[in-house]
């Protein structure tokens, strides 16, 4: 009976303590600037912490931010060798006649995939996006289904796509939170291709001269900004997902992509092109100056070593598979301390990567964040005699 009660208490303890991923700072954080947008979000990508937000789960029209998901599927096709950058794709009548922003391709052309990607990202070309969608999915309709399937797989719970390019359509909506999930996964999953988002100017040979500059004005203002995408429709307003990476020698961890500290800002529904750039720049500046990123533990470093019952090994190391980085208000690093909360007792078998506890990061008495701790090694179940002996020890414990 005592063992049964202990096991049930352990299960309950695990359920209430270990279900969350990284949570944002609890209180007394620096006040964010006033942001003139319907919704916004600032994420410290390196620490995986939301630093500031407004209406992050409000349904909004994404406009050309839709093309982030279209690019995700194109990059996935490149990675799986279903597409090649030098491969050419035809331009259908449907792609040619797409309204809105264009790269000005026509049905007489066979356009390399690499150029279509540049047209989609730099020029925000709806024609390029449609040509890629048809090339990857076989049809736009099939591609849209792939977009929705991928959104579900990524955990984008409040997103629904109706087209590949982002033109206004009933039910074509997303949220700032879902866009942050998509943007971070786009960068981490496809580091070989996200460089397309830093291209400042592009025009496909033989097409008429137009505004060939990337609509992300921050690329021209801030050398640390290297993406990602803008969008506009009358319904959506002016929107932007921007990201910047700054090197911090004392941090020494991998950002996304490359080293240093990376922030991601999302502003939705601003008044004009300059406003979306200004509000994004304001958020990024505040995030880099009001917070600092601190590396507490290396990847695969044991935060704590815990006893294991009924296992072939008597102990298991708990830690993180990636370096543990936290974002804290500037000037509070000296006050940081950690507190480990873990399932007890730990009973084998235990799988490598299994969540078994949390580490709380405190600044004085204030909770900054808490992060899951996982088993860094697998522990197999002991033999019959070993399990029986530990069962007795647990009973009298």
Regions inferred by a protein language model and the residue ranges of each:
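N-terminal secretory signal peptides that target proteins for export/translocation
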Residues: 1-6
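Bacterial N-terminal signal peptides
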Residues: 10-21
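Low-complexity intrinsically disordered segments
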Residues: 8-11, 253
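Sterically constrained small-residue positions within well-ordered secondary structures
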Residues: 18, 31-33, 53, 256, ...
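Domain-terminus/edge residues, biased toward the C-terminal soluble/receptor-binding domains
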Residues: 157, 168-173, 177-397
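Active-site-adjacent loops and short helices of periplasmic peptidoglycan-processing enzymes
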Residues: 25-191
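Bacterial Sec-dependent signal peptides at the C-terminal "C-region" and cleavage site
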Residues: 20-29, 374
């Amino acid at each position: 009976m005592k063992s049964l009660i202990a096991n049930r208490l352990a299960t309950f303890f695990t359920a209430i303590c270990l279900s969350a991923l990284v949570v944002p700072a609890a209180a007394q954080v620096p006040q964010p600037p006033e942001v003139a947008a319907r919704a916004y979000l600032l994420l410290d990508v390196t620490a995986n912490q939301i630093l500031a937000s407004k209406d992050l789960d409000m349904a909004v029209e994404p406009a050309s931010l839709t093309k982030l998901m279209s690019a995700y599927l194109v990059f996935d096709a490149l990675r799986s060798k279903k597409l090649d950058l030098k491969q050419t794709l035809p331009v259908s009548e449907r792609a040619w006649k797409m309204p809105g922003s264009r790269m000005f391709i026509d049905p007489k052309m066979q356009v390399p995939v690499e150029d279509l990607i540049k047209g989609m990202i730099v020029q925000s070309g709806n024609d390029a996006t449609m040509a890629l969608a048809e090339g990857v999915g076989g049809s736009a309709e099939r591609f849209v289904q792939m977009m929705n399937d991928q959104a579900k797989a990524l955990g984008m719970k409040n997103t629904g796509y109706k087209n590949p390019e982002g033109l206004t359509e009933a039910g074509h909506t997303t949220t700032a939170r879902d866009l942050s999930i998509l943007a971070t996964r786009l960068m981490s999953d496809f580091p070989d291709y996200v460089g397309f988002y830093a291209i400042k100017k592009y025009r496909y040979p033989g097409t008429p001269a137009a505004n060939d500059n990337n609509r992300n004005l921050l690329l021209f203002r801030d050398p640390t900004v290297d993406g990602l995408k803008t969008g506009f429709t009358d319904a959506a307003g002016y929107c932007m997902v921007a990201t910047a990476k700054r090197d911090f020698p004392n941090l020494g961890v991998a950002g996304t992509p490359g080293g240093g500290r990376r922030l991601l800002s999302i502003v939705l529904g601003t008044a004009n092109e300059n406003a979306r750039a200004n509000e994004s720049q304001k958020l990024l500046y505040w995030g880099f100056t009001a917070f600092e990123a601190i590396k507490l533990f290396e990847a695969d470093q044991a935060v704590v070593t815990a006893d294991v019952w009924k296992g072939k090994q008597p102990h298991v190391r708990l830690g993180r598979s990636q370096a543990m980085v936290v974002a804290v208000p500037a000037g509070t690093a000296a006050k940081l301390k950690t507190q480990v909360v873990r399932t007890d007792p730990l009973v084998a078998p235990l799988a490598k990567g299994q969540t078994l506890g949390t580490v709380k990061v405190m600044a004085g008495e204030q909770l900054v964040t808490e992060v899951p701790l996982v088993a860094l090694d697998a522990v197999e179940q002991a033999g019959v005699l070993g399990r029986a002996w530990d069962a007795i020890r647990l009973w009298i414990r």
